[in-house]
Amino acid sequence: MNKKSMNLKYLQIKSDRDLNDAVTFLEKGFKWKKFKSDLVKSKFPIINKHLNFHGIMIKDDKEVIGAILFFHQGFINIENEKRSIINMSSWYMHQKYRGLPSISFLRYMLEEFDNYIFTNYSANNVAEKILLKIGFKKMQLKRASLLITESIFNFSNIKIKDIHKDSLKIENNIETILDEGIGIRFLEVKIDRYKLQLITKKRVLRRSIFGVEFNWRTTTIIWTSNEAMLARYWKKICNKLLIYTKSMKLVCDFSSNFPQNALVKENNYLYFCNNQSLDYIAPIQSEMNIFD
């Protein structure tokens, strides 16, 4: 292992060839279906058009042994400074190189892109511990979730409709170009004379009970124009939204408001930023646009 580590090279994924090599490695490691790989390769030039790279990889001689993909979420203005937000996704290392080489790989990422803000929305327990150890922080969020059976009697005159992405009004300090991703919808919720805008992500996961397989459909609210209103009318909105999206479960992360009597669930959203005023970044234009 010591001898092999002398040949390790850290590289930015810039060219089409680099991207193809990294995606081929990740497809094999994560056992993706080929259409996911094709989607990454076709979408990344658009997603990362304001960057000149698509991620990083590590090679031992000429063999890819680790890779991380980047999704450019946009820009955020912090204390009169405009900084890019990068969602790190699909972090995978060859089994023989896990441990210290993995941590060194992450440290390279943070040093090479020291003026960028990094997010991670999909870390498992092991990855979360490693990321926290090197300086990532947990986003200050509380997660609420509700099954359709728990909201079924919350009738209301709330109306929901799909709207064009250009109709959404994202926060003033965020600059981003919204893209139609897989399972992504832009919605308007009308409550009496008030209107609430949402970006949602629908996932269809395969589940099995007593050997019988079925599709488990979950909708996640990844952004809202008015968190206080969403929290106030949580169960009524859930009822309408689950029916509208044909889902069985609704999930949402709240920053300062939280639905009354809702149970707080754990979330695994992380970020790396040297500015103490930032508590969270919504997962808009993140890996959720492509991956489940």
Residue ranges and their predicted role:
Residues I78-A144, V212-Y269:
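Acyl-donor binding region in acyl/amide transferases
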Residues N2-K43, N87, K142-L178, M288-D292:
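Short amphipathic alpha-helix that is part of the acyltransferase structural core
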